[in-house]
């Protein structure tokens, strides 16, 4: 059963797809298979992801059925999908419609595939989860350990080269750019060797956040920075090693969020 928020989003996506096909009929097969043949957002996303992650050894149909079953029994995952689509649409200036993340943004695809692998990990289907992690890394160049904990309203922008380790915790409404590493320092081997990223954090391209540390709410991490120590909330940090350069006004608004018209 669809939530009202999912249903409204899905109807907007389908309507946009129909309008686009009038201008670009050559995309008919792609749009029919990916969007217009489906009654639900979850069915569409299962189709898109299974097409990208299948191999000659595990078929598209088998992966589609696995994903569809997970979505059918876990409304919370679909709720996160909806929030992720909206996050990309609100924060990425090149995204003009909700259809764009669903069809074209590999950061979104990698994130939603991770959510499915995370579910499988949590029910102890470790081998299938590991298979999906490997395929996600190969196809999207994004390496997220299925045991990592990631909230909703997440944007992985460009996404190439993002690495998120096993013990990482990411709260809601976080934006992460390409080539970011959230990992360990190599000095600890326990599960608590990775960072915690609080809500509304923005992590610039190429930044590395390493070790059992906490990045506070609303922090902005500059591109290329290396963070090795706890960062208090509502500051901007840059440099190697990262240092605080200014304080930020307490706000729940993400740095790149577009104003509503």
Curated annotation (Swiss-Prot):
Source organism, top-level taxon: Bacteria
Location in the cell: Cytoplasm
PROSITE patterns per UniProt: HEXAPEP_TRANSFERASES
Reactions catalysed according to its record: L-serine + acetyl-CoA = O-acetyl-L-serine + CoA
Main location: cytoplasm
Pathway where this protein functions: Amino-acid biosynthesis; L-cysteine biosynthesis; L-cysteine from L-serine: step 1/2
Name of the protein in question: Serine acetyltransferase
Species assigned in the record: Buchnera aphidicola subsp. Schizaphis graminum (strain Sg)
């Amino acid at each position: 059963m669809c939530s009202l928020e999912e249903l409204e989003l899905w109807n907007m996506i389908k309507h946009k797809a129909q309008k686009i096909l009038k201008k670009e009929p050559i995309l008919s097969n792609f749009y029919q298979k990916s969007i217009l043949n489906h009654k639900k957002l979850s069915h569409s996303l299962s189709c898109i992801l299974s097409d990208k992650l299948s191999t000659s050894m595990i078929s598209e149909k088998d992966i589609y059925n696995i994903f569809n079953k997970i979505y059918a029994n876990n409304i919370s995952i679909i709720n996160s999908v909806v929030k992720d689509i909206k996050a990309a649409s609100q924060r990425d200036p090149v995204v003009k419609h909700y259809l764009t993340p669903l069809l074209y943004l590999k950061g979104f695809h990698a994130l939603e595939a991770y959510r499915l692998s995370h579910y499988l990990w949590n029910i102890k289907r470790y081998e299938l989860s590991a298979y999906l992690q490997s395929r996600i890394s190969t196809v999207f160049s994004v390496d997220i350990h299925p045991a990592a904990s990631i909230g909703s309203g997440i944007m992985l922008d460009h996404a190439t080269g993002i690495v998120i380790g096993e013990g990482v915790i990411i709260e809601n409404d976080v934006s992460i750019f390409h080539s970011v590493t959230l990992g360990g320092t190599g000095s600890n081997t326990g599960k608590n060797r990775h960072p915690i990223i609080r809500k509304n954090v923005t992590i610039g391209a190429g930044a590395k956040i390493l070790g059992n540390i906490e990045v506070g709410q609303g922090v902005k991490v500059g591109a290329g920075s290396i963070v090795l120590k706890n960062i208090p909330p509502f500051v901007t940090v840059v440099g190697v090693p990262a240092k605080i350069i200014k304080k930020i006004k307490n706000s729940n608004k993400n740095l790149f969020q577009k104003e509503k018209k």
